[in-house]
């Protein structure tokens, strides 16, 4: 990201950037950056996109930026419930990103830094209505470099499935490649370059 901002890219990186921009330009993706979008505006726009363009998934980045005004209770719970009902009505997944509260920062130890359902802002609403809740946890971010068994956690990430209405909960261990903003199987040491990427 910093290299793009500063314009300090190698020739192959410029080629890669050009390739990705063209790919994004041609992608069937719609970005709506309306500030303080209400859940009712979201539902109206989602219905139109599904009907006119066959949209298959909606991602909200992020829940706390939505405007809860105009709701019967003006509450986040009603907002999350409306999003959940919209997903069922449109028969598509809606992924809503959410902030964590500061509780995780004040807890100590390896397990203390793992996010929990209660760490979600407006956790009651999300816990009640979400079909699935997942967290991304990178121990290295908290300067935790090994687990209680001595396993190396440098560059590792966990996907914590904290709630799954129709399945099991659990953790998935992945390798996080920050330089590529990519997650991969922990056993995969070789990165297959994307088109336009330099090998290695």
Put a short name on every predicted segment.
Residues 1-60, 65-97, 102-113, 186:
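Glycine-rich nucleotide-phosphate-binding loops and adjacent flexible coil segments
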Residues 12, 22-23, 36-55, 90, ...:
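C-terminal regions of RecA-like/P-loop NTPase motor modules
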């Amino acid at each position: 990201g910093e290299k793009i901002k500063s314009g300090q890219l190698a020739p192959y990186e410029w080629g890669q950037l050009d390739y990705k921009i063209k790919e994004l330009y041609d992608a069937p993706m719609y970005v709506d950056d309306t500030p303080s979008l209400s859940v009712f505006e979201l539902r109206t726009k989602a219905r139109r996109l599904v009907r006119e363009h066959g949209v298959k998934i909606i991602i909200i980045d992020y829940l706390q930026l939505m405007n809860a005004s105009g709701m019967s209770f003006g509450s986040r719970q009603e907002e999350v419930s409306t999003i959940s009902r919209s997903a069922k009505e449109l028969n598509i997944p809606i992924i809503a990103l959410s902030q964590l509260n500061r509780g995780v920062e004040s807890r100590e130890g390896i397990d203390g830094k793992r996010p929990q359902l209660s760490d979600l802002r407006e956790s009651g609403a999300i816990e009640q209505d979400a079909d699935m809740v997942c967290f991304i946890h990178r121990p290295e971010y908290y300067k935790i470099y090994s687990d209680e068994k001595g396993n190396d956690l440098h560059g590792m990430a966990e996907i914590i499935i904290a709630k799954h209405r129709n399945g099991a909960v659990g953790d998935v261990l992945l390798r996080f490649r920050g330089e590529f903003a990519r997650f991969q199987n922990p056993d995969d040491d070789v990165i297959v370059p994307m088109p336009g990427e330099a090998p290695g």
